[in-house]
């Protein structure tokens, strides 16, 4: 008897998701030989010993499978962490230690912070940033919108080494060209713009801007975005320079603090769709 609630539909295997929380849960099957090889459960991780185990196990094998079916239910009772994170606070301390040690084993210096309410962790990588970031922004006029974007980048970004490349596609507004000259005057070392007056093709414009870039990392940005936090580019750069990472995305918000998207899921809505559209930015 009981009421089903808080469904947890788990995604496919993702090593970085596993660093943010133990999304494997309790129903996990591991070969006994592998469990013995890694030393089984360890003392000192009470409350999160299963998390520590799967972190170590997934470092020793690439054969990790996800069964996309609802196979078990987890009860919620007064003595369970399923009810509240306050029931077993030591479990989250142990989990933080397990993550920290996993990152140390992998040679990735990082700071691990517990996110109360989410029951997960934020990983801040501490390796020195290497290489310049080139921001490529396509536009057709939209002077006021673009001005908000560019001023927010230059006034709020605390990254030490970046450049901005604007690609104009068939712009006609005289105010736009005047603004481009003003930006060249204000940011002579970090700003350039080019005209590409071919028929509109978003991918072609991005490729054109990439050819003009001098950075080791390319950051594709729409002209209607605005920087909120100064460390935005440093965080993206710290992830993109990791050997296992090919591309990095971020959470985008509308002006009313709801989510525009927090990633793209293949298959959602038929082909692909944005996740968490309309949720509050700090929602669970």
Regions found by a protein language model. Give the residues of each.
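Short, acidic, metal-binding catalytic loop of nucleotide-sugar glycosyltransferases
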Residues: 151-161
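Short aromatic/hydrophobic "clamp" motif used to bind/position activated sugar donors
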Residues: 218
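Short, flexible, basic/aromatic active-site loop/helix in glycosyltransferases
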Residues: 3-24, 250, 255, 267-284
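Cell-envelope/extracellular polymer assembly enzymes that use nucleotide-activated donors
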Residues: 52, 131-136, 163
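Catalytic donor-sugar/metal-binding loop of nucleotide-sugar-dependent glycosyltransferases
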Residues: 45, 55-73, 100-114
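A conserved acidic beta->alpha catalytic loop
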Residues: 168-179, 198, 226
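Conserved donor NDP-sugar-binding/catalytic core segment of glycosyltransferases
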Residues: 1-4, 225-271
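Glycine-rich, basic loop-to-helix element that forms the pyrophosphate-binding segment
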Residues: 196-213
